[in-house]
Swiss-Prot record:
InterPro entries: Arg_succ_synth_type2_subfam, Arginosuc_syn_C, Arginosuc_syn_N, Arginosuc_synth, Arginosuc_synth_CS, Arginosuc_synth_type_1_subfam, AS_cat/multimer_dom_body, AS_multimer_C_tail
UniProt subcellular location: Cytoplasm
Pathway: Amino-acid biosynthesis; L-arginine biosynthesis; L-arginine from L-ornithine and carbamoyl phosphate: step 2/3
Protein name: Argininosuccinate synthase
Residues annotated to bind ATP: A17, F18, S19, G20, G21, L22, D23, T24, S25, A43, G129, T131, D136, D194
Keywords: Amino-acid biosynthesis, Arginine biosynthesis, ATP-binding, Cytoplasm, Ligase, Nucleotide-binding
A GO-annotated cellular component: cytoplasm
One GO-annotated biological process of the protein: urea cycle
GO molecular function: argininosuccinate synthase activity; ATP binding; protein homodimerization activity
Organism: Leifsonia xyli subsp. xyli (strain CTCB07)
Record HAMAP family: Arg_succ_synth_type2
């Protein structure tokens, strides 16, 4: 049975995620006029594009909302963001730049917390401003039903009656003015912006064209580092982690992470850190383009991964990147609270994040230009003396040990050479690769395993092998 209503449920309470913008303001007024009972819910997620968030519910009341509530979701969003940081749940990367999934994070928290607030008011029909072509319509659908299985969905922008009457911004503004509603004639930008405490997304309109660059965007979380007329002074910054969580910036400890994140944003924002231009695959597999800001997350991410590489072994780091990317895509699809995500989250937090304790000192310059000055911690696996090119006492291993290790490699090198000979014989290897490797005569790989030894040494080796095999057989360890 479909949970989506195609027409306005007259006489019933309809909750709407209210931003205070033109579209949702008009939706509230239109639903009231047509006989529904609109109830407005606004999430305080620390959005940088709405500094007066506490005033937004009052606007909803002016447009006819019976209930208008502000739901403080900052703490929940910060906590989910720290989990994403620990897990490396970021799958969109290109050209050395990362999108930190700040909008999908916000949707997970907003979707669940607003629907829970609605349920407290016996509101079980929910609408929001997402369009049918985007990701948010599915994200909110999933999170809404997870929070309230009885939920039904009504979106004015999927209602033919609403769209035919109020199909564009001109029609909406005229409709509001004709009925005497307050109308904030916001300056029309060349793109749309959505933000929360972790980051900002700029997309649509002019940014849909790939000949429009990052430089048409006016950042809201920091400086436009790409502008030559803006001075950016170098700055030395330290970031401290305990058990995978950031706890201090520049030596100042933060007991409350909700206070730490804005400070990280301010530091990174002074340099334009963490801005990226990405082409991505939406949930429906259509390509879209976005310009993203996340100065604080970028700063924390740099320090976190520096410690990660200094602490964990190669396979653990590889699992972090592989599973983190999988988790990032699941979050992007609105599956952050699904079992497969919880499984990955728990594993990465427990076995990767819990070991990340230490401090990283950086020199920030302009944009993503930075230098790591120092890395310290109580449990680093990095020890210079292990691989020092200088003479050291009590070395972990010596030349003879390495000769033995290299000799053991002969087994798999011979196998690899045999495969190359096989491929060459069937014509699979040609062109530049064949020119690089040279002649691949079949059977020559055996020479890798053959040793040039005297008959006496060969006889001794055979005696040792025979004795070893006999001892192993007698001990039951063969």
């Amino acid at each position: 049975m479909s949970k989506v209503l195609s027409s306005l449920p007259v006489g019933e309470r309809v909750g709407i995620a209210f931003s205070g913008g033109l579209d949702t303001s008009c939706a509230v007024a239109w639903m009231r006029e047509k006989g529904a009972v609109p109830c407005a819910y606004t999430a305080d997620i620390g959005q940088y594009d709405e500094p007066n968030i506490e005033e937004v519910p009052g606007r909803a009341t002016e447009y006819g909302a019976e209930i208008a509530r502000l739901v403080d979701a900052k703490r929940a969003l910060v906590e989910e963001g720290l989990i994403a940081l620990q897990c490396g749940a970021f799958h969109i990367r290109s050209g050395g730049k990362t999108y930190f999934n700040t909008t999908p994070l916000g949707r997970a928290v907003t979707g669940v917390m607003l629907v829970r607030a609605m349920r407290d008011d016996d509101v079980e029909i929910w609408g929001d401003g997402s369009t049918y072509k985007g990701n948010d319509i599915e994200r909110f659908y999933r999170y809404g039903l997870i929070a309230n299985p009885r939920l039904r969905i009504y979106k004015p922008w999927l209602d033919t009656a609403f769209v035919e009457e109020l199909g564009g911004r001109t029609e909406i503004s005229e409709w509001l003015v004709a009925r005497g509603f307050p109308y904030r004639d916001a300056t029309e930008k060349a793109y749309s912006t959505d933000a929360n405490i972790w980051g900002a997304t700029h997309e649509a309109k002019r940014l849909e064209e790939l000949d429009a660059g990052l430089d048409i965007v006016e950042p809201i979380m920091g400086v436009a580092a790409w502008r030559e007329d803006i001075e950016v002074a170098p700055e030395t910054v330290s970031v401290s982690f305990e058990y995978g969580r950031p706890v201090a910036l520049n030596g100042i400890e933060f007991a409350d992470p909700v206070a730490l994140v804005p400070e990280a944003n301010a530091i990174g924002g002074r340099h334009g850190l963490g801005a990226s231009d990405q082409i991505e695959n939406r949930i429906i597999e259509a390509k879209s383009r976005g310009i993203y800001e996340a100065p604080g997350m970028a700063l924390l991410h740099i320090a976190y991964e520096r410690l990660l590489n200094a602490i964990h072994n190669e396979d653990t780091v590889a699992n972090y990147h592989t599973e983190g990317r999988r988790l990032g895509r699941l979050m992007y699809e609105g599956r952050w609270l699904d079992p497969q995500s919880l499984m990955l989250r728990e594993s990465l937090q427990r076995w990767v994040g819990s070991a990340i304790t230490g401090e990283v000192t950086l020199r920030l310059r302009r944009g993503d230009d930075y230098t790591i000055l120092d890395t310290t911690g109580p449990a680093l696996s990095y020890h210079p003396d292990k691989l020092s090119m200088e003479r050291v006492g009590n070395a972990a291993f010596g030349p003879a040990d390495r000769i033995g290790q290299l000799t053991m490699r002969n087994l798999d090198i011979a196998d690899s050479r045999s495969r190359l000979e096989q491929y060459a014989a069937t014509g699979l290897i040609g062109g530049p690769t064949a020119e690089l490797v040279g002649e691949l005569q079949e059977g020559s790989a055996r020479s890798i395993l053959e040793l040039d030894v005297s008959p006496e040494d060969d006889a001794l080796s055979r005696e040792i092998d025979a004795s070893s095999e006999g001892a192993a057989f007698d001990a039951g360890t063969d």
